[in-house]
């Protein structure tokens, strides 16, 4: 179905354009395309787009050389770039826009298509891609036939087209990424773009060869180490084999000793049995003789025992009588002691009476003296004047002081309460400030974790603020404080992280000082921003928020956060935060109406961000929406106004606290004055009161003392009478003591008589007892010897039986160990046996001792057996397997050595192959880089700048780390610096990128190159120079097709006949393509030029 005529847009090229033939390709390799009528295989003849991005339908016919695609922003220039990429099976990631191919279909359409016709010798190639929005899938056709994407990719690859290579295809969104490419990535992209087809393959082979070489080197090293360890291990095993045979020799000796041991034990038992029999016969004879010698001694002991019995009875009787007499003596002695104690108590009582009477007389004397003194003092007091009026005056002044103190105490209590309240308020305010400062530290830690260079620069700034004349602000994410943590995600999604971590300067000279220190000297990758000279922080939004509330918008982005004036001014200028409304879920449901009715460029719904671009001509709107990611930094919010207010309140509170403290000290001084005056008045009152009551007190004291004196005089004791009574009591007790003493003397005499009689009896009994003791001692010695002899005879009999049985058992065990029958005797062969242990690596056998020459005593055999066992136990962990293991390891070492030799030979062969492959790759590569460097250097020299391109590698053998290094210098007072995303400005990076691509242009191995809006950010001088270089390079005969997309052109530029200028316009009032007369248009332009 034909497209509506008014929407068709066709770009055609004048057929009279001239082209040059392409000559031979550099380095002598065959080109992918062949030159036919000025075109290379793979160059683009036609691009047709239907319902694609901003286009309903359009056809583009580019020329064979330089194609300048010019048009205002939003007209659809980049749409042509997108069509080339997607139409040639490129990935959406290459474009850096939407990640789904369905997003490239025009809004409101269900499908769109791209058709690209490529020149190919023998028949052009037409590739068609139809994109379906519903399932986000594409249908492919080649020359009208249905094919899959893989087939299209193969066709494109065969034509040397690489839309993913930034050296060939550089879309607008990827311009900045060119400078971010590593040296290695740039080298690979250059190889693919302008190198021979086999160059990149050789490079990949070299990297693979090098990787395999490393693997072989590691294998050889590991095998060498393994063989060395195996040899060491086998050497240890050889030692274990020696130890195994040594252990076996000891075990054989143990076996031989264990065979002889029972025979030696049997012989020892037999000899001991003969000795026991002889000893038993001798013991029996001695026992019989001892029994005959004991009989007379027993009879003599019996006679003495009969004589001792009467003496024993008499001594017991005397002992009882002596005990009775002693008891009586003790009783009388106790009675005498009690009487003596009674006399002492009577005398003590009399002495106490005397002391009491003496004290009584002293008290009477003292009382009389006190009465006289009191009468004298009373006479003096009666002469003093009346003190009552003065006491009344003192009481009045004390009451006035008490009233004043109550007033001061009330004021002090009120001030103390106010002081406590002020202290509590200060603590609360200080805590809030500390909490805010802690939140700022958390944000700073997050910054350090994300970008350490920025954090290092922040520390330097804080230490060197005195070096700057104007305001210098820390990174924006530390200066921005969102008013509600829920708003943080909108601010972060709108402002790039590169700006959030940027330092903001009020003065440009301060920024230059800062960047010179941290970027050039400290080599830190930081961003800095100069605030606008005219503040825009208070710029008004284009529409009142009240007019937008019906769509769900509730505020503008600027109102969601606070920031210093310079920071806010920059954000308003750069990000238009004062014109970015934020809406709710209602906004999302009304998004189509919002897009159509409101003239907005950026807006937020509850969880999405929309970017709108309105075409200048057609007024059509293209939108890009993306999800709002959660906040990472700004959700930690600190209200700067609240913080400032808290600091002011804290200062006011501390001032009030100090004022209250000073007033309290003044009141304390007043209280001290009152206290001193009260003490003086109370002392005076006390003195006057004492003086007033002293007369009455003296009279009372005199009366009391006189009463006490009369009572003491009436209670006088008669000591003479008491003394007579004491003497009579002592005399009566002494009479009782005389009677007791007489009885005590009689008892003592009786006890002495009985004791003498007992002594005489004991002496006679001791004589008989001594004689009996001697006889009993002699008898006990004989009886003990008799019992000992009897026990010895019994023990010998038992030992004889035990040894007999033991000998039989030992004989049976010895024959069993030697494998003999019960009736056999020890053979001569066993007596003289020899044992040989022959290790496989020894030449001479080592005989063991003969059986007959082994020790002949059990102790010697046990000693030797223990020694052999101890020695054999020293050889732990050994078995027959150690010999097998030794032999097996020896064989394995020989096999490994053979394998190692094979690996070394293979490694040497691999190194030879690498050397040959290196020559095939490195020499052409150096020539290619040298050619690029010549062009690049010449281009920069023509711009009065300096630049060079070289092949860079850290180590010659690390082929995966080879890279192309671009170094440039734009100012005469600086040195060459490597092209990075950080050191050069955006315009400088664009110039460098463009000139590098121009350096590749004449080496043209690719059919075409595309560069989209790379001149953005260039200053006019550099832009004019770059344009001249592009025209001069891309319009030569031997060059590939070139697409240069730009929204603007400077005046009075130089053009070439080989150029094709494609002007892109759109709008509601565009002239339909079928009514466009390009010849008439050119004629009118020439006429206007002639008139001018």
From Swiss-Prot:
GO terms for biological process: cell division; cellular senescence; double-strand break repair via homologous recombination; positive regulation of maintenance of mitotic sister chromatid cohesion; telomere maintenance via recombination. The flexible hinge domain, which separates the large intramolecular coiled coil regions, allows the heterotypic interaction with the corresponding domain of SMC6, forming a V-shaped heterodimer. Residues 450-635 are annotated as: Flexible hinge. Residues 12-22 have a biased composition (Polar residues). Residues 146-449, 636-806, 878-921 form a coiled coil. The lineage of its organism: Eukaryota, Metazoa, Chordata, Craniata, Vertebrata. It is found in: Nucleus; Chromosome; Chromosome, Telomere. SUPFAM superfamilies: P-loop containing nucleoside triphosphate hydrolases (SSF52540). Residues 1-27 are annotated as: Disordered. The gene is smc5. It holds the Pfam family SMC_N. Core component of the SMC5-SMC6 complex, a complex involved in repair of DNA double-strand breaks by homologous recombination. The complex may promote sister chromatid homologous recombination by recruiting the SMC1-SMC3 cohesin complex to double-strand breaks. The complex is required for telomere maintenance via recombination and mediates sumoylation of shelterin complex (telosome) components. Required for sister chromatid cohesion during prometaphase and mitotic progression; the function seems to be independent of SMC6. Gene3D superfamilies: 1.10.287.1490, P-loop containing nucleotide triphosphate hydrolases (3.40.50.300). This is Structural maintenance of chromosomes protein 5. Forms a heterodimer with smc6. Component of the SMC5-SMC6 complex which consists at least of smc5, smc6, nsmce2, nsmce1 and nsmce4a. Belongs to the SMC family. SMC5 subfamily. Keywords: ATP-binding, Cell cycle, Cell division, Chromosome, Coiled coil, DNA damage, DNA recombination, DNA repair, Mitosis, Nucleotide-binding, Nucleus, Telomere.
């Amino acid at each position: 179905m034909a497209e509506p005529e008014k929407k068709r847009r066709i770009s055609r090229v004048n057929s009279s354009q001239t082209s040059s033939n392409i000559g031979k390709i550099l380095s002598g390799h065959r080109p992918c395309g062949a030159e036919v009528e000025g075109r290379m295989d793979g160059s683009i003849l036609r691009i047709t787009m239907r319902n694609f991005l901003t286009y309903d339908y359009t056809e583009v016919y580019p020329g064979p050389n330089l194609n300048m695609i010019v048009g205002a922003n939003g007209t659809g220039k980049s749409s042509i770039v997108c069509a080339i990429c997607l139409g040639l099976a490129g990935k959406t990631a290459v474009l850096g826009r939407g990640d789904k191919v369905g997003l490239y279909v025009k809004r409101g359409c269900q499908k769109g298509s791209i058709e690209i016709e490529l020149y190919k010798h023998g028949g052009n190639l037409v590739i068609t891609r139809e994109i379906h929005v519903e399932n986000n899938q594409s249908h492919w056709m080649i020359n009208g036939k249905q094919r899959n994407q893989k087939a299209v990719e193969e066709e494109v690859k065969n034509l040397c087209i690489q839309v993913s290579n930034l050296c060939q295809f550089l879309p607008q969104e990827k311009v900045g990424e060119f400078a971010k490419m590593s040296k290695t990535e740039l080298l690979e992209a250059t190889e693919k773009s302008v190198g021979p087809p086999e160059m990149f393959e050789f490079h990949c082979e070299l990297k693979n060869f090098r990787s395999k070489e490393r693997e072989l080197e590691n294998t050889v090293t590991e095998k060498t180490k393994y063989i060395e360890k195996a040899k060491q291990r086998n050497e240890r095993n050889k030692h274990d084999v020696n130890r195994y045979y040594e252990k076996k020799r000891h075990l054989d000796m143990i076996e031989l000793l264990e065979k002889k041991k029972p025979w030696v034990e049997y012989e020892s038992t037999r000899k001991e049995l003969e000795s026991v029999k002889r000893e038993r016969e001798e013991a029996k004879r001695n026992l019989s003789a001892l029994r005959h010698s004991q009989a007379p001694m027993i009879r003599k002991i019996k006679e003495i025992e009969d004589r001792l019995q009467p003496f024993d009875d008499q001594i017991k009787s005397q002992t009882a009588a002596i005990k009775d007499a002693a008891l009586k003596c003790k009783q009388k002695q106790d009675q005498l002691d009690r009487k003596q104690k009674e006399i002492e108590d009577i005398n003590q009582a009399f002495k106490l009476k005397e002391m009491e009477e003496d004290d009584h007389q002293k008290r009477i004397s003292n009382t009389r003296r006190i009465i006289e003194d009191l009468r004298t003092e009373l006479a003096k007091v009666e002469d003093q004047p009346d003190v009552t009026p003065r006491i009344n005056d003192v009481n009045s002044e004390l009451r006035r002081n008490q009233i004043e103190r109550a007033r001061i105490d009330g004021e002090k209590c009120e001030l103390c309460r106010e002081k406590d309240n002020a202290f509590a308020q200060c603590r609360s305010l200080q805590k809030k400030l500390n909490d805010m400062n802690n939140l700022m530290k958390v944000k700073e830690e997050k910054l350090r974790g994300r970008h350490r260079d920025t954090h290092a620069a922040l520390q330097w700034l804080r230490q060197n603020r005195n070096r700057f004349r104007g305001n210098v602000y820390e990174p924006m994410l530390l200066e921005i404080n969102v008013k509600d943590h829920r708003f943080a995600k909108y601010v972060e999604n709108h402002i790039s992280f590169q700006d959030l971590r940027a330092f903001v300067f009020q003065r440009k000279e301060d920024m230059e000082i800062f960047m010179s220190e941290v970027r050039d000297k400290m080599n830190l990758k930081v961003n800095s921003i100069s605030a606008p000279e005219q503040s825009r922080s208070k710029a008004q939004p284009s529409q009142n928020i009240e007019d937008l509330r019906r769509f769900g918008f509730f505020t503008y982005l600027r109102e969601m956060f606070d920031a210093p004036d310079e920071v806010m001014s920059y954000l308003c200028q750069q990000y238009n935060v004062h014109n970015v409304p934020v809406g709710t879920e209602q906004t999302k449901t009304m998004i189509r109406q919002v897009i159509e009715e409101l003239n907005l460029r950026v807006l937020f719904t509850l969880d999405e961000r929309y970017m709108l671009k309105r075409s200048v001509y057609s007024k059509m709107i293209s939108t890009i929406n993306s999800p709002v990611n959660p906040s990472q930094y700004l959700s930690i919010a600190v209200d700067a106004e609240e913080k400032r207010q808290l600091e002011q309140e804290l200062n006011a509170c501390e001032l009030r606290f100090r004022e209250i403290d000073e007033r309290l000290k003044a009141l304390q001084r007043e209280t001290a004055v009152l206290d001193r005056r009260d003490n003086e008045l109370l002392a005076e009152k006390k003195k006057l009161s004492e003086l007033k009551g002293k007369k009455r007190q003296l009279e009372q004291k005199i009366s009391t003392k006189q009463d006490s004196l009369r009572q003491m005089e009436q209670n006088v004791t008669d000591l003479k009478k008491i003394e007579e009574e004491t003497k009579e009591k002592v005399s009566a007790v002494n009479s009782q003591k005389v009677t007791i003493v007489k009885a005590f003397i009689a008892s003592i005499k009786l006890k002495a008589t009985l004791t003498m009689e007992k002594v005489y009896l004991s002496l006679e009994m001791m004589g008989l007892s001594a004689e009996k003791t001697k006889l009993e001692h002699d008898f006990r010695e004989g009886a003990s010897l008799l019992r000992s002899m009897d026990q010895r005879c019994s023990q010998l009999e038992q030992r004889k039986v035990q040894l007999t049985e033991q000998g039989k058992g030992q004989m049976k065990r010895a024959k069993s160990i030697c494998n003999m029958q019960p009736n056999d005797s020890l053979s001569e062969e066993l007596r003289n046996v020899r044992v040989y242990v022959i290790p496989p690596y020894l030449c001479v056998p080592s005989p063991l001792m003969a059986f007959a020459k082994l020790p002949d005593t059990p102790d010697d055999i046990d000693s030797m057996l223990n020694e052999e066992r101890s020695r054999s136990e020293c050889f732990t962990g050994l078995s027959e397997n150690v010999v097998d293991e030794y032999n097996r390891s020896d064989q394995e070492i020989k096999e490994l050595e053979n394998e190692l030799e094979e690996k070394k030979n293979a490694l040497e062969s691999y190194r030879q192959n690498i050397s040959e492959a290196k020559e095939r790759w490195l020499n052409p590569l150096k020539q290619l880089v040298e050619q690029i460097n010549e062009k690049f250097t010449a281009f920069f020299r023509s711009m009065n700048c300096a630049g060079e391109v070289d092949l860079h590698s850290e180590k010659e053998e690390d082929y995966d780390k080879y890279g192309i290094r671009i170094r440039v210098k734009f100012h005469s007072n600086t040195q060459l610096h490597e092209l990075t995303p950080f050191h050069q400005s955006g315009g400088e990076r664009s110039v460098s990128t463009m000139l590098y691509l121009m350096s590749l242009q004449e080496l043209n191995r690719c059919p075409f190159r595309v560069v989209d809006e790379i001149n953005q950010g260039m200053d006019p001088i550099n832009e004019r120079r770059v344009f001249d270089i592009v025209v001069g390079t891309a319009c030569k005969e031997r060059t590939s097709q070139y697409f240069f997309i730009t929204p603007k052109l400077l005046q009075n530029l130089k053009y070439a006949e080989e150029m094709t200028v494609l002007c892109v316009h759109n709008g509601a009032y565009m002239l339909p393509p079928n009514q466009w007369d390009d010849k008439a248009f050119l004629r009118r332009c020439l006429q206007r030029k002639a008139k001018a």
